[in-house]
A protein has these predicted regions:
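Two-component/phosphorelay signaling modules centered on CheY-like receiver
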Residues: 10-29, 118
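C-terminal output helix
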Residues: 18, 106-118
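Acidic, metal-coordinating helix/loop segments flanking the phosphotransfer/catalytic sites
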Residues: 30-50, 71, 89
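Acidic catalytic/metal-coordinating carboxylates
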Residues: 33-36, 61-65
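Active-site T/S-Asp motif of two-component receiver
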Residues: 53-54
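Receiver (REC) domain active-site loop signature in two-component systems and cognate sites
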Residues: 57
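Alpha4 helix (beta4-alpha4-beta5 surface) of REC/receiver domains from two-component response regulators
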Residues: 64, 84-102, 109, 113
Length: 123
């Protein structure tokens, strides 16, 4: 399956996402903020297939992370998670960079389906 980096500062939601994606057999790395996620991306030399990140996080938010990841690791698909309508609008300004923006709350099946779709190669 895929190598996925999950950046989420909320412990409960992060655990839910990890559980859902583990069920699908993905190899996961977790980070609690954007700086830690960017460090993981740089350390792994872009071996990740997908960056799944929350938009609103401390230290570095998901938008800044997506911009840095897209610039430095263009082969990594990017998917954003947010519970805030204004953040969804802001994220949709990144359409060329971000594969999808998923609205919180979401079910296990919704996140699994969105990840499966994000992992389909874009042309």
């Amino acid at each position: 399956m895929a190598k996925i980096l999950v950046a989420e500062d909320d412990d409960t939601l992060r655990d839910l996402v990890v559980r859902a994606l583990n069920e699908d057999g993905h190899e996961l790395t977790v980070a609690t903020d954007g700086v830690a996620a960017l460090d993981a991306l740089n350390r792994q030399n872009s071996e990740f297939d997908l960056l799944l990140t929350d938009v609103k996080m401390p230290v570095m938010d998901g938008i800044a992370l997506a911009l840095a990841a897209g610039r430095d690791h263009p082969d990594v698909a990017i998917m954003l998670m947010t519970g805030f309508a204004d953040q969804r609008e802001r994220a949709h300004g990144l359409d060329a960079l971000v594969h999808d923006v998923i609205a919180k709350p979401f079910s296990l099946e919704q996140i699994k389906g969105a990840v499966r779709e994000a992992l389909v190669p874009r042309h």
